[in-house]
């Protein structure tokens, strides 16, 4: 009975968790439970997620992948997510990730973000991290701006641009943005820009500190970063 109640509590607070993530969360809380039992209880309670998976194009499936990151601060990835306040005013959020540790290094929301602001956000991150070798970006105007080009030159960073019209070239950050939208942006009303910033930052901290990632051996990004010799930033 207690296991069933805890499963309900986790599912209610983390609406995009399937039974596998709930099983990991239970284990992290010290509960000894079989994953098959978690799956059975999850289904009995009608908590099944219904996810429509996108159809993968053959050309994308056969694309030669970029070399994977093998160390922290080797490859970062950057992109934008758009959303709105409760009154319809638009906002944009810059997402910045370490591809190896899966850490969300920054999620900065504003009404609009220029190339100069992108450079300033990167400078702020460099107060706690070393500069990466490469940053993967798309061909958006903020990323092809003179301000970011100059920043990259001054810090010895290569800007690795995606091919136009090929979001799969930066698939990791696209996947992260999907989680951000499902677990945060779609779960809240933002009453103001400050309210949006506070809720997005709270989710970023949860993602880094408390959300286990299957690709990291069910560790959180901060736990994995610590094992890799990085002192996780704020």
Question: PLM ranges: what are they?
Answer:
Residues 1-234:
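Charged DNA-binding/catalytic regions of mobile-element recombinases
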């Amino acid at each position: 009975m207690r296991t069933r109640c805890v499963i309900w509590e986790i599912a209610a607070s983390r609406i995009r968790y399937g039974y596998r993530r709930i099983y990991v969360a239970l284990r992290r809380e010290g509960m000894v439970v079989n994953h098959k039992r978690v799956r059975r209880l999850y289904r009995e309670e009608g908590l099944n997620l219904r996810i429509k998976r996108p159809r993968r194009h053959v050309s994308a499936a056969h694309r030669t992948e970029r070399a994977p990151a093998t160390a922290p601060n080797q490859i970062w990835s950057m992109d934008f997510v758009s959303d709105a306040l409760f009154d319809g005013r638009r906002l944009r959020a810059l997402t910045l990730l370490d591809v190896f540790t899966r850490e969300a290094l920054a999620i900065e929301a504003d009404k609009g973000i220029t190339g100069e602001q992108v450079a300033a956000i990167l400078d702020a991150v460099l107060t706690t991290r070393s500069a990466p070798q490469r940053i993967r970006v798309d061909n958006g105007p903020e990323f092809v701006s003179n301000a970011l080009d100059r920043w990259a030159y001054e810090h010895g960073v290569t800007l690795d641009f995606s091919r136009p019209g090929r979001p799969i070239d930066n698939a990791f950050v696209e996947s992260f943005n999907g989680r951000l939208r499902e677990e945060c942006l779609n779960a809240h009303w933002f009453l103001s820009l400050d309210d949006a910033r506070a809720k997005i930052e709270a989710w970023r901290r949860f993602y880094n500190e408390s959300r286990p990632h299957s690709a990291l051996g069910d560790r959180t990004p901060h736990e994995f970063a610590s094992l890799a010799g990085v002192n996780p930033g704020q």
